[in-house]
Amino acid sequence: MTRLYLATAYAQQVVPNLDSPENEKTAQMAIDGFEQVLKKNPNEVTPIKQIAALYFDLQKFDLAKQWQMKVLQAQPKDAEAAYTIGVIDWTVAYKNATKALNSVGLQDNGEGNPKMPKKICNEIKTENTDLVNEGMQYLQQAVNLRPNYDDAMQYLNLMYRRKADFACGNKAEIQADLAQAQDWVNKAMDARKANEAKANSRVTQGVVMGK
């Protein structure tokens, strides 16, 4: 347990998205510690989750996704792991799309980017099709596991907006994807309201119980 506590202490010092040698060194010390724990206890999920989170904080998305997959292997019903894989896929797809659009002086409009040249559309389709398909699969899995998972629903909205890029300006296809996106926005809002009502109910019950 001492090794786990030490690795956790290092992990708590890591600053998300900070690209510096010191931050990376601290993260690597934490990762090394968690991997030592896994050598003795291969089925312990906590260090697997910690390593996945550290790679995400370092923006090493391929490694973060690999470790989240390991979380799901150990705990197939872990909704947060499935959600995080979807977030990673969207993040990479978004970066790919904005980079391609910026190369021809365009900004992402989040609605299929109908003004982009065919060449750029094909480039985005090539880079992002697998990411969007996989991301949707895991985000849907997260919602299936946790029906009121409003964050996962919001990312499904964002994923459909990335999928709309693949229409290459076809208005009907773009509108179909944007309709799906809006549907997930509505579902997310309903889920959030339900979650807030449930949380408020617990607080109220706690106050009554405490009297």
Model-assigned labels for residue ranges:
Residues A9-Q36, D57, I88-Q141, R162-D190:
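Short coil/linker segments at helix-helix boundaries
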Residues A53, A197-K211:
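Helical anchoring/docking segments at protein termini
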Residues Y83, D150-M159:
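Amphipathic alpha-helical protein-interaction segments enriched in hydrophobic
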